[in-house]
Every structure is written in structure tokens, then in C-alpha cells.
């Protein structure tokens, strides 16, 4: 039976695994407290956080939330980078920090209940931000509509030119400009 403190930690980790849009498991061995603090600050700007977790408690939390797929990643010192916002921004920031520090390493992650390898997390980080993807989708939807408007207005425009030419023939230039 876990102590009340461990039970609270299990519940907190369970909540993270249940609600986070992305959870990245990292090995933080050798990372200084100052570096961790700076990394946490940068993550908080992106609605993300960094938390050192115990593997046994995380394993229990994963079993309770149906995310047991992460248990193979729970070896050695583990810290969770989790995002409640844009998962791409959190992945980019984590990989950028890992490259800069040369100490933090990505073990893998969890996205929508699916296990991500370290390579998958890197691939996720190369995606454009959510807003840019949405803009591309909207642009893709608008382009056919503009084409349809062009096609439908073509015959009307042609009729207008024919009528203006006829008015010029019948009444002269002044009548055509007035029309």
C-alpha cells in the first residue's frame, strides 16, 4: 500500500498522462538545477512543464490510465515534459534544449495514447505550428471556392461585355460609359 504522499504523486502523474496533449519522457542525468529551472521557464511559456518522476510511481500511474505502452521507457532517471497546449511547440522546445545542453536526452513520448520513439518525437518537432497547419487547411478549402466563383462569374462577365458593345453600337460612347 503506497504512502499518502506516493498516492498523491501517482494521482498527479495519472492526471498528466490522462490530460496532456503530449508527454515526452527524458533522461535528465547530469542536468544542473539552474538548467532545469531555465528549461521549466521556457516550457511554461508554451503551456508545458517539466517534472522529475519516479519510474515505479509512473509505471503504476500508466497502468491506471491505460497508457502502459510507456513502461519500456521507464529505465534510469526519468523526467516528463508534458504539454497541455500545442504538442509541436513542446517537442520543438525539448529537442532544442536537448541539443543545447547535450545532457538531456529524449527516450520517447506519448501522443494521444500512442507510444512515440525518440525519432517520432523528432519528426513531430519538425511539423509546422498548429496555426500554420490550420491556415494551410483553410487556404486549401478556399482555393476551390475562388475558382468556382471565377468560373461562375465568367459567363456573366462575358454577357456584360456583349451588352456594353451593343450599347456602344446603338447609342455611342457616352451611353456605354453610363451603363
From Swiss-Prot:
Gene3D superfamilies per UniProt: 3.30.70.1730, 6.10.250.290
Entries under InterPro entries matching the protein: Ribosomal_uL10, Ribosomal_uL10-like_sf, Ribosomal_uL10_bac, Ribosomal_uL10_bac_type, Ribosomal_uL10_CS_bac
Keywords, comma-separated and alphabetical: Ribonucleoprotein, Ribosomal protein, RNA-binding, rRNA-binding
A molecular-function term among this protein's GO annotations: structural constituent of ribosome
Top-rank taxon: Bacteria
PROSITE patterns in the cross-refs: RIBOSOMAL_L10
SUPFAM superfamilies per record: Ribosomal protein L10-like (SSF160369)
Gene Ontology CC: one annotated term: large ribosomal subunit
Keyword rRNA-binding: yes
Gene Ontology biological-process entries: translation
Physiological role: Forms part of the ribosomal stalk, playing a central role in the interaction of the ribosome with GTP-bound translation factors.
Subunit structure: Part of the ribosomal stalk of the 50S ribosomal subunit. The N-terminus interacts with L11 and the large rRNA to form the base of the stalk. The C-terminus forms an elongated spine to which L12 dimers bind in a sequential fashion forming a multimeric L10(L12)X complex.
UniProt record similarity statement: Belongs to the universal ribosomal protein uL10 family.
Protein name per the record: Large ribosomal subunit protein uL10
Organism encoding this protein: Thermomicrobium roseum (strain ATCC 27502 / DSM 5159 / P-2)
Record lineage: Bacteria, Pseudomonadati, Thermomicrobiota, Thermomicrobia, Thermomicrobiales
Gene label: rplJ
Amino acid at each position: 500500500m503506497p504512502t499518502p504522499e506516493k498516492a498523491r504523486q501517482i494521482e498527479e502523474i495519472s492526471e498528466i498522462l490522462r490530460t496532456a496533449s503530449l508527454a515526452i519522457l527524458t533522461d535528465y542525468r547530469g542536468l544542473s538545477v539552474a538548467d532545469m529551472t531555465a528549461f521549466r521557464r521556457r516550457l511554461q511559456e508554451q503551456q508545458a512543464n517539466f517534472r522529475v518522476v519516479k519510474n515505479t510511481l509512473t509505471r503504476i500511474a500508466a497502468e491506471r490510465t491505460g497508457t502502459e505502452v510507456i513502461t519500456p521507457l521507464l529505465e534510469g532517471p526519468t523526467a516528463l515534459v508534458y504539454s497541455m497546449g500545442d504538442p509541436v511547440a513542446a517537442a520543438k522546445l525539448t529537442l532544442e534544449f536537448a541539443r543545447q545542453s547535450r545532457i538531456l536526452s529524449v527516450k520517447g513520448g506519448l501522443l494521444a495514447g500512442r507510444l512515440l520513439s525518440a525519432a517520432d518525437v523528432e519528426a513531430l518537432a519538425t511539423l509546422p505550428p498548429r496555426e500554420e497547419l490550420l491556415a494551410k487547411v483553410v487556404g486549401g478549402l478556399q482555393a476551390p471556392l475562388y475558382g468556382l466563383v471565377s468560373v461562375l462569374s465568367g459567363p456573366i462577365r462575358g454577357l456584360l461585355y456583349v451588352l456594353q458593345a451593343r450599347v456602344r453600337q446603338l447609342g455611342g460612347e457616352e451611353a456605354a460609359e453610363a451603363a
